[in-house]
Each structure stands twice: as structure tokens, then as C-alpha cells.
């Protein structure tokens, strides 16, 4: 090998650090998510709206755009459903996708089936809609925030109910990026 030229120095080869240890995923708080969930295609006729669903499914310009998107590329995000006692499935999140699939001429759509309590279903449904929808009427927002409040209060219904109510308001505010006062204005 040639000796190094004057004025140039060679650094010792760098040692490569060992790759970091893989992170251990946190334990799911919701046991229903501990199982592997799969996307299944369910017949639209087996899907039923969530009871007391506070959000309107309107045949407006947004729906027409969604129908066109479904026609061109299918449903990109699976609906979240839970089994119904009387058969079929209750839609937790995906009412607009179901309507768009129907209007686009589809017979089925992708869904994730999850066993959920009523409170878990309410929180999943309201979270999805409050975060995803472009247009929400003030009345829809008020009703969905009230549903979240009641579900959170019900889940933590131990001890002092006034304290549980206060904590529920704070929790609803945190979930939606709102102050407690703003939440109160919507629901009372």
C-alpha cells in the first residue's frame, strides 16, 4: 500500500454501534385489541347503523366525492363493526363508507369485527367521527360530546359522582382538544 500523502491523515475505522434493542410494545389497555384483528368483507345487508348514531349520513357533495372514490379505488379504510345479538353487525365507524359502497354498486365492504361494550363502542364511534369528518353540525358535535361524557362517566362510576363527572369533562376535553368550559357549553 502507498503511504499517506503529506497533510492527510487517515482516521481509524469507526466501530458500528450495535442496533438498539427492539422496543417492547405496550400492553393493550383494551383486551379486545389483544387478539389479532383481520379485515373481512361483509355483505352490506348484514351491516346495521349504530343505535343513537348522532351523525347524519347525508347525500351531499362530500358523499358524491366519496362514492366516486369508492368506485375508482374501493373502500380504503375498513369499517369498524361489532356483532349484534340478533345477527349481523352494528357499524361503529363507517356509516358513510357503507352508504358510499351501496351507491357505488358494491355488495360488500371491508370491515374489522371487534367485540366491544356499549361504552367502548360509543367512544370509538365518537372519536372516529369527530376526528375524520370534514363537516359536523353543532348539534351533532354536542350530542357526540355528551355521549362521550356519559360513557367515560359510566366507565369510572365509582365513588363520588360529582368528582367522576368533573374528571369525565376533563377527559372529553383532552380527547377533543377542548377546554372543560368549551365541552360544558356544548353538552349543557
Language model features by range: what are they?
Residues 1-114, 121-132:
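Short, charged/polar connector segments at secondary-structure boundaries
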Residues 55-57, 63, 98-188:
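Amphipathic, charge-rich alpha-helical segments that serve as recognition/docking helices
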